[in-house]
Amino acid sequence: MRPLFTIHAGEYLVGEHIERTYPQWNVWVPSKDTGIDLLVTNASNQKAVSLQVKFSKDFNPMQGSIGWWNHDSAKIQKSKADFWVFVLPSFSDKKTNFIILPPGELLRRFKAIHGMGGKRIQSYLRVTKKKRCWESRGLGKADLDLIDIDQFSDRDRDFTQYLNAWKQIEKKLK
């Protein structure tokens, strides 16, 4: 039997987090695929924020958590979502992290970090035990070691301001 409707794990985790943390908000699931995975409205349903959700399992249980994504740059550029939400559950601390940012800023950073030689962008977002967030694809072992000891510095690769950054959604729904 084929299900009529399903949501993926990342959408579920985002929706569950919102309903637990912001019980006054409403979470909606669109009935057709338009590039918007979840719609979040304020209590009166007068203001809305659209989310594109990307999920990855944790690939590094020892050093915080690391997720891997493969993006199409054209989809990011054409995205109608207000925010992209990267969902990264951690093996080590049993907590789910959310990296939340507008698609325009995401694409700007990817261009600065990886260039735009092709239309596919592979991304490794890493959350350290000290709650810093980095785009680490393409870095050598020395830089990865610096990330692990909280000594690395690169403005474009530093995604910490977007780590669990629900306040930007709160502002839009006020």
Ranges and model annotations:
Residues 1-34, 39-174:
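Mixed-charge (Asp/Glu-Lys/Arg
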